[in-house]
Amino acid sequence: MRKKLWIVVIAAALLCSACAKSDTTKADASKPDADDSFWMSDITDEIFERIKGKSFKDDCTLPREDLRYLHVLHVDLNGETREGEMIVNYHIAEDVLEILRQLYEAKYPIEKIRLVDKYDADDERSMEDNNSSAFNFRFISHTTRVSKHGLGLAVDINTLYNPYTKIVDGERILEPITAEAYLDRDADFPYKIDHEDLCFKLFTEHGFEWGGDWEDRKDYQHFEIPTAQIEEWYPENQ
């Protein structure tokens, strides 16, 4: 009887050990779950400490409560999955989260999605590093109106390869300054946004306008909510 009991105990122990080993192997082999990795939150105290005095400047007039933090996944040019984070206005948070999810599922390459605060809210440094971002508070030059990035209602994607450019008094303005090689929009190069691009299609389907369609200047990286809609949301910002 005692011998049979020991056999049962040993068998049970072996079974539990096998189960534990199986669970550990499964956990070690797991990859990021897209459903679990795409989420949003309010601007917590911890997040606020990261942006205070940088993208959320001391003179920021936009309530902290109007912003949302997004956690996403994206794929780089090598097909590697990366984690990303972005801050946008609550009015567009669900749309942007869905757009970035669809881009990830399509393996659309985005090199970096980091808060601009990693660059001390310096747009030029962020763009030169080909970083994709959204919220960065600032007023429109010589006005008291907040810019669309300052409201968190504009998103820039793959910024080095999709620069901003304008001719002023016969001279070309280029941002970032290191993007001259990507001014020729007929050339073939990675990360380029045009009318056939999935990024363009998804953002415009969600009601955004593309800076590449502007006539007086071109901002190929830039997607924004139309001014008329913003005036409804923020009538005081006129």
Locate each region found by the language model.
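N-terminal, intrinsically disordered, polar/charged segments of Gram-positive cell-envelope systems
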Residues: 20-56
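Mid-length scaffold segments of soluble, non-membrane domains
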Residues: 110-111, 125-160
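Catalytic cores and adjacent binding grooves of peptidoglycan-active enzymes
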Residues: 140-143, 158-238
